Regions:
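Terminal amphipathic alpha-helical/low-complexity segments used for targeting or macromolecular assembly
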Residues: 1-140
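A short, contiguous structural element within a folded domain that forms the immediate neighborhood
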Residues: 138, 147-148
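Left-handed beta-helix
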Residues: 143-145
């Protein structure tokens, strides 16, 4: 029970930081207001914001963002550890990369972070025996982010 609460606190702390940064950046760069609203401020949770980013980046003519988002949310709902790992990854980027000063930067801009989070979803699907969709996602990830 204590471990679950600690994980939830990590995710919530990261999410609170991201939302505060987005509000601040909206005042600094009003032209990006819609971007920050759609990407962060209109999302209820870190999982929703990450799912939004991944689905919109990986969307294709044969796999629209809305379908991908449902799939990603399904994984996040079944295994909250995937979201905790993403929050820890994000925090590690901020702590270890001197070029990254905002918690929102990896979520919004860094393809390496987004690729890893996408692969976490694909890996979960593979473990669940959903090999074809995992292969399909791997292909989308490779094409979109340029990583294998």
């Amino acid at each position: 029970m204590a471990q679950i609460q600690a994980q939830e606190e990590i995710v919530q702390t990261v999410w609170n930081n991201i939302r505060a940064e987005a509000r601040e950046m909206m005042t600094q760069e009003p032209m990006l207001g819609s971007f920050f609203l759609q990407s962060i401020l209109n999302q209820q949770t870190f999982a929703a914001a990450l799912g939004f980013q991944l689905a919109n980046r990986l969307a294709s003519a044969v796999m629209p963002a809305v379908v991908l988002r449902e799939l990603i949310n399904e994984v996040y709902n079944k295994d909250p550890n995937v979201i905790t790992a993403a929050a820890l990854d994000l925090r590690a980027v901020v702590d270890r990369d001197p070029a990254v000063v905002y918690y929102s930067s990896p979520l919004l801009y860094l393809k390496g972070f987004l690729a890893i989070q996408s692969y976490r979803v694909a890996h979960y699907l593979w473990i669940e025996g959903r090999h074809e969709i995992a292969y399909f996602m791997q292909n989308l990830i490779s094409i979109t982010f340029g990583v294998d």
